[in-house]
């Protein structure tokens, strides 16, 4: 089952976890290094995650959801979706 419940952008709906992470990171004008610093990993790890060369641990996945959920509260939450949905419902991930 792909995420589409909260997604308002047809181009983004149905994409995989890595695409969603990259999309949100870029929407928030955050570099890979900045995201890595916030979750305690290197820029290279974020790059590998976004390019499908690395599957995050449950802990890292949780940390990423916390960063994006906090950031989304500062803006228009309606145009985003909950990051937890990506990790729970992304069939390509499992």
Question: Which residues are covered by each model-predicted region?
Answer:
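Short, charged recognition helix plus adjacent turn
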Residues: 1-13, 66, 73-94
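Short, leucine-enriched amphipathic alpha-helices that occur as contiguous helical runs
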Residues: 14-18
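Short basic helix-loop element that most often maps to the first helix and adjoining turn
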Residues: 19-34, 63
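Residue-level detection of the helix-turn-helix DNA-binding "recognition helix"
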Residues: 22, 26, 40, 51
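Short alpha-helical DNA-recognition segment
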Residues: 29-48
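Hydrophobic micro-packing sites on short alpha-helices
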Residues: 61-68
């Amino acid at each position: 089952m792909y995420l589409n419940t909260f997604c308002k952008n047809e181009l983004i709906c149905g994409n995989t976890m890595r695409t969603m992470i990259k999309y949100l990171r870029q929407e928030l004008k955050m570099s890979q290094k900045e995201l890595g610093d916030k979750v305690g990993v290197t820029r290279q790890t974020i790059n590998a995650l976004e390019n499908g060369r690395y599957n995050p641990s449950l802990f890292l996945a949780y940390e990423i959801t916390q960063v994006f959920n906090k950031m989304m509260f500062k803006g228009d939450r309606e145009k985003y979706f909950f990051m937890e949905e990506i990790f729970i419902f992304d069939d390509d991930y499992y």
